[in-house]
A protein has these predicted regions:
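Extended mid-to-C-terminal alpha-helical interaction segments
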Residues: 146, 150-181
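DNA-contacting interfaces and partner/effector-binding or oligomerization modules
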Residues: 1-160
Length: 181
């Protein structure tokens, strides 16, 4: 099964499984009372169909976790992989408040591999623990906008840059007013 809080990712996963692998997935909505009451979505397939899909993706059952070597060879594959991981478990805070992009992961070794993959784009990602989860995160505005470009999210990048400019103009105006008084 694949679980996500992003409805669009769940629907896309459902369609890809059905159309590419000709399996019959089930889409389950999980209602959550905690974590802000946000729903989660689980796409499920049977055991034999799951083995078929994993084999079709080149994933061996019981294989160690990490970034598949084939992904790291070409830049376009690295970019697509990062985009997919972000859609599955990433978030960006409101740039009007702070600059923070994170991936929330269960597996520490995958988090370390993801950090190394991000470093190949000359970005400095950090790793931290939050309860039982491992975070890979970026803090700076320029690093986050660069990462959004890697994802191919140009409109989000421009929105973040606009927010940064507005914030800087407000701060400069406040400094000028404070200096005059």
């Amino acid at each position: 099964s694949i679980e996500t809080e992003n409805n669009a990712v769940a629907r896309r996963t459902f369609r890809l499984l059905r159309d590419v692998f000709d399996v019959q997935p089930e889409l389950v909505t999980l209602r959550r009372s905690r974590l802000g009451g946000r729903n989660a979505y689980r796409v499920e397939i049977s055991g034999s169909e799951a083995s078929f899909v994993l084999e079709g993706c080149g994933i061996e059952v019981g294989q160690r976790r990490g970034v598949p070597r084939e992904i790291t060879v070409r830049k376009c594959c690295r970019m697509s992989f990062l985009r997919g991981v972000f859609l599955a478990c990433g978030s960006v805070t409101d740039p009007e408040k702070e600059y923070h992009l994170e991936f929330v992961l269960e597996d520490e070794s995958f988090a370390a591999a993801l950090q190394r993959l991000i470093a190949r784009f000359s970005l400095n990602a950090h790793v931290a623990k939050r309860r039982s989860m491992t975070l890979v995160y970026l803090k700076g505005q320029s690093e986050i906008t660069d990462m959004l470009s890697i994802f191919g999210a140009q409109s989000a990048r421009f929105a973040m840059e606009d927010a940064y400019i507005r914030k800087e103009l407000r701060n400069n105006a406040n400094r000028a007013v404070n200096c005059d008084s």
